[in-house]
Amino acid sequence: MADRLTQLQDTVNQQAEHFCNSIGILQQCSVPSKFPGFERTGSQTPQQNQQEDYAQLFSTLISRCAKDIDTLIESLPSEESSIELQVQALKRLEIENQESAEKLEEVVRKGELLLEKIQAALSDIAQSQLDMQYSSSPKKQ
């Protein structure tokens, strides 16, 4: 997962792409303007596009991307957060990390005990099967 700054860069780049694409669509869909003293021969009818409403599409994409940019900017740490607050947050995270490590060690210890019990039970079952096979086989004399 990318950090917040990289996400912000990617979202700004995406917004720039939306702007460029919307300008390209405007150029494709626009009616050519006539300039006095300049007559051009050839087809001057714009291409008919699909029925899709490009203006609505790009306005939705651009506004959604702008909201994402605002959200990412708000999630960045501010200068107002002092060194003391950052140190307290780090200490709290270290304590949570230590507690999680202790819980993990306890779970691993219990898992190892269960594994030993299961292995002992499987060994007993295998030995019982061998004993039953040995006792039920005919003895040669």
UniProtKB/Swiss-Prot annotation:
Where in or outside the cell is it found? Nucleus
The alphabetized UniProt keywords are: Activator, Coiled coil, Nucleus, Transcription, Transcription regulation
Q: What protein name does the entry list?
A: Mediator of RNA polymerase II transcription subunit 21
Query: One MF term in GO for this entry?
Result: transcription coregulator activity
The keyword Coiled coil is annotated on this UniProt entry: yes
The scientific name of the source species is: Aedes aegypti (Yellowfever mosquito)
What is the documented function of this protein?
Component of the Mediator complex, a coactivator involved in the regulated transcription of nearly all RNA polymerase II-dependent genes. Mediator functions as a bridge to convey information from gene-specific regulatory proteins to the basal RNA polymerase II transcription machinery. Mediator is recruited to promoters by direct interactions with regulatory proteins and serves as a scaffold for the assembly of a functional preinitiation complex with RNA polymerase II and the general transcription factors.
The coiled-coil regions, if any, are 79-122
